[in-house]
Amino acid sequence: MIGDRWVYSNNLQETYQFDSQGRLVEIRTPNARSVSLVYSADNVVVTSEAGEQLIFTQDIKYQPLTLSAQGLEVDYSYDGNWRLLGVQKNRAGSITNRSFLYENQMYPRFLTGIIDENGERYATWTYDASGRVVSSSHADGADHTRVAYNADGSTSVTNSLGKVTNYQYQIVNGVKKVVAIEGEPSPNCASSNSTFTYDDRGLLKTKTDNKGIVTTYDYNERGLEVSRTEASGTAQARTVTTEWHPSLYLPLAVTEPDRITRYRYDDQGRQLSRTVENR
């Protein structure tokens, strides 16, 4: 905590501050730029360090109603069930509308389609009786993808070219993890015919690709990768180790077979220097 504020920092070195009511009041990025949020009974004003402002209003569910920023005005509309029905944008008098559809009677809150600014159906989703998505497509059936949920717990995905990829899963530390991908290699599925194992924390331990080449991984107590060995167990094995900053999610040194790269940062996590030493 800082004063009466709660502070959250992520592994991207972004910092979020919340007030005593749990409202986000500041965002700070690694380059020390910040955005502040000020709340009133009427609206929320978001201000950047450069003085640029974005103002929005919310309903009682904290869903956006209006937004204005630098010549752009946006209005959001909802039905009686709080479902987003439309977004209207007005930029210098040019007005566009986008609509959202909910056509599944069994799951009336599930999004089934989007009507774009030209009045054309841009996207369509369908679901099975269990509420799982079974198909996705864009206008005129482009990028049509089908999903089948198999009795053994695996999932089969058929892309728009008719290629089928099968995903097998395992529950690791309470989280569903992919343990095998089987199918024809394609730009959309570069990891076809690969297998994966995980440690007790659910972190990736090994990956075996479609050529049988194994990559192994090790982590520190913070869950950060400290060692990765490619082509493990072969004469071509290549190991990369990483030394991490004790409190920030930033590398201090990355050691590869032919070089060591070292980094220095200031107290806010901004990179001060990067040096490369040949080995």
Task: For each feature predicted by the language model, list its residue ranges.
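Extended charged/polar low-complexity repeat regions
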Residues: 1-279
